[in-house]
């Protein structure tokens, strides 16, 4: 085993290979394989006389986690005196990589009025260190939430999966339309004293639901009806609706409940202003009807 990022000095001895016959005859040792005579070349070398094997430079586990070499022993004439042996060299991981979020900004949404426990989004960070050790085990936490309304803890995050869910009631789009949540990922199983960390931003948009009825701006509207004319707007009814403008939750639909038994009027919705346009659709005779009291 070789720890990565060793400071040396190099070359640094790893093992010594010896043949049982080296007391009887001179032996020459060599190694072959990736890291010796195959790229990357000469990461490892061996003293041909003593059999001492060395690493010549710092290792990087994230570049290569292990090496498989073969050691050979021959006599002075090049004749094999031992069968080649396999050498497996494993690079020991060090915590030298921070967790890296897949995205720096995540966008998610949640309906206003959602119950605690409602899923919002998932954030993910990867760590290049060994995931079977604490060096590569990432844990998540929420650092800040802006705004802190109606509570400073409107959301929580699963420390292992990165799933963000609501944890408190009170999401109201008409009060807070968007939250900015700073999320931190820390390796060493979330140990803030020893682990390496990184942060990302989660933008959570509170989506509108139809939780506000339209309200007339006044209880009485007045208008004048021209005699014997149709397709004329005689009154504009104004309403206020706190739901998201120009959404289905905001668009008003007007209906005449009473006061127009003969069907002289209809109320159409202005798609821009949401006003109700009281329109003459059947000609009115002044001599028969001098006034109408419509309930809408």
Curated annotation (Swiss-Prot):
Source species, domain of life: Eukaryota
Domain called Cadherin: residue spans: 1-101, 102-216, 217-296
Glycosylated sites: 107, 236
Main location: membrane
One protein family per Pfam: Cadherin
Cellular component, GO, one term: plasma membrane
GO biological process assignments: axon extension; axon guidance; heterophilic cell-cell adhesion via plasma membrane cell adhesion molecules; homophilic cell adhesion via plasma membrane adhesion molecules; positive regulation of axon extension
Keywords: Calcium, Cell adhesion, Cell membrane, Glycoprotein, Membrane, Metal-binding, Repeat, Transmembrane
Subcellular location: Cell membrane
Topology versus the membrane: Single-pass type I membrane protein
Residue ranges annotated as Extracellular topological domain: 1-296
Keyword Repressor carried by entry: no
InterPro entries, per database record: Cadherin, Cadherin-like_dom, Cadherin-like_sf, Cadherin_CS
Matches recorded under SUPFAM superfamilies: Cadherin-like
Alphabetized GO MF terms: calcium ion binding
CDD domains recorded: Cadherin_repeat
Keyword Glycoprotein among UniProt keywords: yes
Function of the protein: Cadherins are calcium-dependent cell adhesion proteins. They preferentially interact with themselves in a homophilic manner in connecting cells; cadherins may thus contribute to the sorting of heterogeneous cell types. May play an important role in retinal development.
PANTHER family per record: CADHERIN-23, CADHERIN-4
Domain notes: Three calcium ions are usually bound at the interface of each cadherin domain and rigidify the connections, imparting a strong curvature to the full-length ectodomain.
Name of protein: Cadherin-4
Species of provenance: Rattus norvegicus (Rat)
Record gene name: Cdh4
């Amino acid at each position: 085993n070789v720890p990565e990022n060793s400071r040396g000095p190099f070359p640094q001895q790893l093992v010594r290979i010896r043949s049982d016959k080296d007391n009887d005859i001179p032996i020459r040792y060599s190694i072959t394989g990736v890291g010796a005579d195959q790229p990357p070349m000469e990461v490892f070398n061996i003293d041909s006389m003593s059999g001492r094997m060395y690493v010549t430079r710092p290792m990087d586990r994230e570049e290569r986690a292990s090496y498989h070499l073969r050691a050979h022993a021959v006599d002075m004439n090049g004749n094999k005196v031992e069968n080649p042996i396999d050498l497996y060299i494993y690079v020991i991981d060090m915590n030298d990589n921070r967790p890296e979020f897949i995205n720096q900004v995540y966008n998610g949404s949640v309906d206003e009025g959602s119950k605690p426990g409602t899923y919002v989004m998932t954030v993910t960070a990867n760590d290049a260190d060994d995931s079977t050790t604490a060096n590569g085990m990432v844990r998540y936490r929420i650092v800040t939430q802006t705004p802190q309304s109606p509570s400073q803890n409107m959301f929580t995050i699963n420390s292992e999966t990165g799933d963000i869910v609501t944890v408190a009631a009170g999401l109201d789009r008409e009060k807070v339309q968007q939250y900015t949540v700073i999320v931190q990922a820390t390796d060493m199983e979330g140990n803030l004293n020893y682990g390496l960390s990184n942060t990302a931003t989660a933008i959570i948009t509170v989506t509108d639901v139809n939780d506000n009825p339209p309200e007339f701006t006044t209880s009485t509207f007045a208008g004048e009806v021209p005699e014997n004319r149709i397709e004329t707007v005689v009154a504009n009814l104004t309403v206020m609706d706190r739901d998201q403008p120009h959404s289905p939750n905001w668009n008003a639909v007007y209906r005449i409940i009473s006061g127009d038994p003969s069907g002289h009027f209809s109320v159409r919705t202005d798609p821009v202003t949401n006003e109700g346009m009281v329109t003459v659709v059947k000609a009115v005779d002044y001599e028969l009807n001098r006034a109408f009291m419509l309930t809408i």
